[in-house]
C-alpha cells in the first residue's frame, strides 16, 4: 500500500519575535496540496529499520523517515522493524515541507501497521521532537500556526489551484533565519485579518537577495498572478481560479525550470486516506 506524504505551502509567514533559546516566534498559515511523495512500508519480524531508497545527498542517519521510525520504535517498543521505500516528488530545500511530511507519514503509517495505538495528540508531540512543521502534517488540516509553529488552529481558506515553480537551488533555512536583514518584529495579526487578505512572507526579501534563481521565478510568475514564496523557499507559487487557467500558465514555463500545478486542500490527502480507513 502506498501512503501519501503531501506538500504544504505557507500562505504567509511573519516573525513576531525571538525567544531566549534562539527560536523564532512566528505566525503562519499552512495549507496542503494534492501533490505528494509516496511511501511504502514492509513490516519486519526483526527490529531492523531500513530505507531501501536512500535520498541523494541525505545521510540515512539524518533522514527524517528513519529518525521518525526509530523515534516511534523507541517510544512504543513494538518488537518489529520495517523496510521503507519512497517515491520522491517534493523538492529538498524547497519550502514545501517534504522532510516534515515524510516524518509525519512514517509516524502515522507505522502507528497503524505496528498497532502501537498512540493518539493523534501523542503522535504530534512525538513529531515535534523531529521538527516544528511535523505536527501540522500529523493533524492533517489547514491551520493557523503560532509559537514556533506548533500552536495550531484549524482554518478554512479558499482552495484554489496553484502553479508552483521549483527553482534550481536549495535554500538554507538556517541561513535565512540567521540573516541580520531579517525582520523579526512583525506586528501580530489575527486570523480574520489574514483571511481578508493581510499578510506576506517576511523571509522573501532576504531570500531574493541571496538566491537569484528564486528572484527570477518570482518575477516571472508575477506576470500571471500574485507570486509568493513558501516558507523559506525556494519554491514560489501563485493561485488561480481554475485548473485550466493554472495549466495554461504552467505551459508557458521556461524549459529550464521545473513546475507543477496542484489543488489546495484544507484536509491533507493522508488525513483523507486515514478517515476512509477508520
Task: Tell where the protein language model's regions lie, with residue ranges.
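ATP-binding N-lobe of GHMP and related small-molecule kinases
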Residues: 1-93, 112-121, 148, 166-167
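ATP-dependent small-molecule kinase catalytic core of the GHMP/sugar-kinase superfamily
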Residues: 2-4, 12-28, 116-225, 239-278
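Residue-level signal for inorganic ion chemistry
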Residues: 11, 39-41, 65, 99, ...
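A generic structural signal for alpha->beta connector loops
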Residues: 36, 48, 78-81, 159, ...
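Short, basic/glycine-rich phosphate-binding loops at helix/coil junctions
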Residues: 45-58, 106, 128, 193-201
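Short, active-site-adjacent cap segments at secondary-structure transitions
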Residues: 47, 91-92, 171, 235-237, ...
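A broadly conserved amphipathic alpha-helix scaffold signal in soluble, globular proteins
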Residues: 70, 105-111, 125-128
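Glycine/serine-rich anion-binding loops at beta->alpha junctions
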Residues: 85-114, 226-240
